[in-house]
Amino acid sequence: MAPRAGQRGLWSPLPGLLLLAAALSRPAAPCPFQCYCFGSPRLMLRCASGAELRQPPRDVPPDARNLTIVGANLTVLRAAAFAGGGEGATDGVRLPLLTALRLTHNNIEVVEDGAFDGLPSLAALDLSHNPLRALGYRAFRGLPALRSLQLNHALARGSPGMLDALDAALAPLAELRLLGLVGNALSRLPLAALRLPRLEQLDARVNALAGLGPDELSALERDGDLPQPRLLLADNPLSCGCTSRPLLAWLHNATERVPDARRLRCASPRVLLDRPLIDLDEARLGCSDGDAHESGEGIDVAGPELEASYVFFGLVLALIGLIFLMVLYLNRRGIQRWMHNLREACRDQMEGYHYRYEQDADPRRAPAPAAPAGSRATSPGSGL
């Protein structure tokens, strides 16, 4: 029945509501296989599928912001691996909004040149805990916005040229702020990392650093308003000889740039084993070779702590001496009487000994010798 004139239609809003419900119930694009999506749009994806995942998922939504892959078997990261690159790929999906990429514990051994092409907004990359054996000289190209790079426990198994490759790969990262190189058995720090203009912190703990040379220390200096980078160097086998003088002088002048300066300890020579480096005096560190250096010959171990203890001991002795003099001064009259009485007693004793000596030495007081037995006594006038 048609509605009467002037009467509002009861079913007129129904088509609009149906259209709205259909729009809201429209199924969203599914998550990549073996991944979990969080947020809408998919701000975060987590893929932890085990060893069967051998390459990054190619159907990652283009609006993804964070991507985490843990526990996979991504042995080789080929060029444009996260933009659909790799073997058999002709056209990959770009991820223009991806800002954080975490790839820890994925058994990654090789990172080829341009492995992260197609990620222009990437700001944080974590490759920690992967047995990297080869790193492309341009592995981190195409990452103009990268600010944090974590390579902790990832380079220890690398080839002898790994440090050179790392130097070349880090050079184009002009916006890098944080660099993690913990537990990589590094014998030196990559100079390219130290020269990054905006670097704020370099974490190089638990490595094989025996010290920092003049070239490394000079690369840490910045001119103008650029930030002065901080270093974390704890748990490195530092050699506390004459070669450590530049590092020790730099530490004394820039302690605030090494937050763990008190944890820097000597590993050699033996005489300085486990001594805090910052407590030593660079002028006292001698240079020796071979066994002499190992035994500590030529190295003066009297550091500020020992000198301070000597000064404190001297002050204590001076205080004790001052107290002793004050006691003597306050009791001077009693001490004088005691000395006088002692002198008189000694005099009386000596006079007694002198009197006895005089008596014993007088011959008239000597007794007459006794007559021998059987002899007859005679008088002086008997004539016999």
Swiss-Prot record:
Please list which residues make up the signal peptide: 1-30
* Bias kind Low complexity: ranges: 367-384
Annotated membrane topology: Single-pass type I membrane protein
Q: What SUPFAM superfamilies does the annotation carry?
A: L domain-like
The record's listing under Gene3D superfamilies reads: Ribonuclease Inhibitor
Per the UniProt annotation, where are the glycans attached? 66
Q: Which InterPro entries match?
A: Cys-rich_flank_reg_C, Leu-rich_rpt, Leu-rich_rpt_typical-subtyp, LRR_dom_sf, Wnt_signaling_inhibitor
Keywords assigned: Disulfide bond, Glycoprotein, Leucine-rich repeat, Membrane, Repeat, Signal, Transmembrane, Transmembrane helix
- Gene Ontology CC terms: membrane
Q: For this UniProt entry, which segments traverse the membrane?
A: 310-330
Hey, which stretches end up on the Extracellular side? 31-309
> In this UniProt entry, which cysteines form S-S bonds?
31-37, 35-47, 240-266, 242-287
Q: Where in the cell is it found?
A: Membrane
Question: For the region Disordered, what residue ranges are annotated?
Answer: 361-384
Q: Where are the LRR repeats?
A: 61-84, 95-118, 119-142, 173-196, 198-219
Annotated coiled-coil segments of the chain? none
Q: Which residues lie on this side of the membrane: Cytoplasmic?
A: 331-384
* PANTHER family to which the protein is assigned, alphabetical: LP06937P, TROPHOBLAST GLYCOPROTEIN-LIKE
**Protein name as catalogued:** Trophoblast glycoprotein-like
- Report the source organism: Mus musculus (Mouse)
